[in-house]
From Swiss-Prot:
GO cellular component, one term: small ribosomal subunit
Biological process annotations from GO: ribosomal small subunit biogenesis; translation
Domain S4 RNA-binding residues, every copy: 87-149
Keywords: Ribonucleoprotein, Ribosomal protein, RNA-binding, rRNA-binding
Entry's family note: Belongs to the universal ribosomal protein uS4 family.
InterPro entries: Ribosomal_uS4 (IPR022801), Ribosomal_uS4_bac-type (IPR005709), Ribosomal_uS4_CS (IPR018079), Ribosomal_uS4_N (IPR001912), S4_RNA-bd (IPR002942), S4_RNA-bd_sf (IPR036986)
Transcription regulation keyword on record: no
Originating species: Clostridium acetobutylicum (strain ATCC 824 / DSM 792 / JCM 1419 / IAM 19013 / LMG 5710 / NBRC 13948 / NRRL B-527 / VKM B-1787 / 2291 / W)
Name of protein: Small ribosomal subunit protein uS4C
Complexes and interactors: Part of the 30S ribosomal subunit. Contacts protein S5. The interaction surface between S4 and S5 is involved in control of translational fidelity.
Any GO molecular function: structural constituent of ribosome
Function: One of the primary rRNA binding proteins, it binds directly to 16S rRNA where it nucleates assembly of the body of the 30S subunit. With S5 and S12 plays an important role in translational accuracy.
Length: 196
């Protein structure tokens, strides 16, 4: 499992974005970051790359593979990269609302709690395809934390995923449009970082 060694709140404040969705993550940043340091173009590109890696919890080796795949795609490389990341199984589990963070979603997948089209899949990086149905194993649906998350989390109700409360599942209806992905990042700068 990908692990980030820097404390989560500290990393969020350093990158200037709440990558973990915790309400207290940016508290100190808002009160202390009144004067911004001038950042070079290289520094800006690096921050955008680190922001995207940290948000999706992907380490450098795998992230660079995603970038290479995106650069081979016919559509804009930045858009393609975001779509690849957004379709990771751990992220889809998070978007559906089974978990309150991508980190928690990754643990659920790794521990075999998640089904894709009715079959257990324990690979967080698995690329969910359009039409795939992702569900929670039936024996875990009574777990209070998972059921509360699924029924109550509306932070990431996204139009490209259809939730089915009766079946504890979500279906990837289509690939997302860039403006629908709930993270503010300069994806073009990320591609440019790897193009140099």
């Amino acid at each position: 499992m990908a692990t980030m060694r820097e404390p989560r709140f500290k990393l969020s404040r350093r990158l200037g974005v709440n990558i973990y969705g915790h309400p207290k993550a940016m508290k100190r940043f808002e009160t202390t970051n009144t004067r911004k340091k001038k950042i070079s173009d290289y520094g800006m590109h690096l921050i955008e790359k680190q922001k995207l890696k940290a948000y999706y919890g992907v380490l450098e080796k795998q992230f660079s593979r995603y970038v290479k795949a995106a650069m081979k795609n016919k559509e804009a490389s930045g858009s393609s990269l975001l779509k690849i990341l957004e379709c990771r199984l751990d992220n889809v589990v998070y978007r559906i609302g089974f978990a309150n963070s991508i980190r928690q979603a990754r643990q659920m997948v790794s521990h075999g709690l998640i089904l894709v089209n009715g079959k257990k899949l324990d690979i967080p990086s698995y690329e969910v395809q359009v039409g795939d149905v992702v569900s929670l194993k039936e024996k875990h649906r009574q777990n209070e934390m998972f059921s509360n998350n699924f029924m109550n989390l509306s932070t990431f109700n996204v139009p490209y995923i259809e939730k089915n409360p009766d079946e504890f599942s979500g279906k990837l209806l289509r690939l997302p449009n860039i403006d629908e992905i709930p993270i503010k990042v300069n994806e073009v700068a990320v591609i440019e970082f790897y193009s140099k």
